[in-house]
């Protein structure tokens, strides 16, 4: 996403919201069949960067915290945590008796090892920036850039088996969102050291710590997950199996849902959205996401390089008409990069936000 002010015209927050057709009333068996659209690029939690695998990995791996159905942060592998007065140091206290899916003890150093692998240049992971840019962990940039290989320089440590300490260069209250994602998945070093990255797609070798464990991987077809009996909250995991189906064409996936082949789809063609909402209102679910759609301008064009012109275009664009009359995808018009997904987030003060569209257009003409 482009981050320089004035380079883009923001227009819709969550315009590509995950649109969910509710699960069929009764599962045909003990398996929840979910559509994920395109095939995953990787099932390696320290490498994956696509949404398709994200659903799978979120079931197979758990970070230090988790999220409830409303998106609120709740305890995950860590049952409690606290922050220093200056907000630069977060200390997470793991639950007692955590285990990997194979029964091995899960300890704090496993989380540290996961981050170290992400930052290792040999891993060729695009996710290192989470740690040296998004939350600016001490020592993360030097490790990612190959300036040092000393793991002791990283500001993420495990003083004992049940404590993870994260030390940052600057305060980052959004750190909890990061450590709750599979980006902060722990690494089972014994299996990885024995089999390398190949263990993540080999059901006979993969070891994870989430509610489910990968049991079957069939390229261009599906990934089957089975309930992990060693998960700390296994008693509350009610569905024995989850099967993720690949369907490259969004229209075809919708047909598979309507035929009862899958129970949930997150891909609905925009052309069908209005009709489906009217015909099956009890099945369509629209929920907010952090996805943002925006216009990006070619700054090599002398006219578009003029920041005043770009600002005028942004002011003149009627985002409400664009969403409600044209796109009709359930998005929320926005004037900033950060939308309203996080109820605790206080956005920037934008003067134009209190203007009518007519006033914005008048200002654009100036």
Describe the residue ranges of each PLM region.
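Short, well-ordered beta-strand elements
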Residues: 30-41, 79, 89-92, 111-114, ...
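A structural "hinge/loop" feature
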Residues: 38-54, 77-78, 104, 126-127, ...
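N-terminal lobe/hinge region of extracytoplasmic solute-binding protein
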Residues: 35-85, 116, 205-208
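Extracellular/periplasmic solute-recognition and catalytic clefts
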Residues: 215-226, 243-301, 312, 320, ...
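Surface-exposed binding/hinge segments that line
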Residues: 93, 119, 123-190
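Gly/Pro-rich hinge or "lid" segments in bacterial periplasmic/extracellular proteins
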Residues: 151, 162, 168-237, 241, ...
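Structural transition elements
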Residues: 333-366
């Amino acid at each position: 996403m482009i981050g320089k002010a004035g380079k883009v015209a923001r227009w819709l927050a969550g315009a590509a919201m995950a649109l969910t057709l509710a699960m069929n009333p009764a599962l045909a068996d003990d398996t929840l069949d979910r559509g994920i659209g395109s095939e995953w690029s990787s099932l390696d939690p320290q490498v994956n960067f696509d949404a398709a695998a994200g659903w799978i990995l979120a079931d197979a791996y758990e970070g230090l915290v988790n999220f409830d159905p409303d998106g609120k942060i709740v305890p995950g592998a860590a049952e409690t945590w606290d922050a220093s007065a200056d907000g630069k140091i977060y200390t997470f206290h793991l639950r007692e008796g955590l285990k990997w899916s194979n029964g091995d003890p899960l300890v704090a150093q496993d989380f540290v090892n996961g981050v170290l692998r992400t930052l290792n240049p040999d891993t060729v992971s695009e996710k290192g920036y989470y740690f040296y840019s998004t939350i600016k962990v001490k020592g993360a940039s030097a490790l990612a850039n190959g300036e040092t290989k000393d793991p002791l320089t990283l500001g993420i440590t495990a003083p004992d088996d049940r404590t993870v300490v994260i030390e940052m260069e600057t305060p980052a209250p959004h750190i909890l969102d990061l450590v709750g994602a599979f980006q902060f998945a722990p690494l089972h070093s014994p299996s990885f050291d024995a089999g390398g990255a190949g263990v993540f797609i080999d059901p006979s070798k993969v070891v994870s710590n989430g509610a489910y464990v990968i049991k079957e991987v069939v390229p261009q077809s599906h990934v089957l997950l089975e309930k992990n009996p060693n998960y700390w909250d296994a008693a509350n995991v009610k569905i024995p199996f989850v099967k993720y189906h690949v369907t490259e064409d969004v229209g075809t996936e919708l047909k598979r849902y309507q035929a009862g082949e899958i129970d949930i789809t997150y891909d609905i063609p925009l052309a069908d959205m209005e009709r489906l909402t009217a015909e099956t209102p009890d099945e369509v679910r629209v929920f907010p996401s952090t996805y943002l759609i925006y216009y990006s301008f070619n700054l090599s064009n002398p006219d578009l390089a003029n920041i005043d012109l770009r600002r005028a275009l942004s002011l003149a664009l009627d985002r409400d008409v664009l969403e409600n009359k044209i796109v009709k995808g359930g998005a929320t018009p926005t004037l900033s990069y950060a939308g309203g997904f996080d109820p605790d987030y206080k956005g920037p003060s934008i003067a134009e936000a209190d203007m009518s569209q007519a006033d914005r257009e008048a200002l654009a003409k100036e």
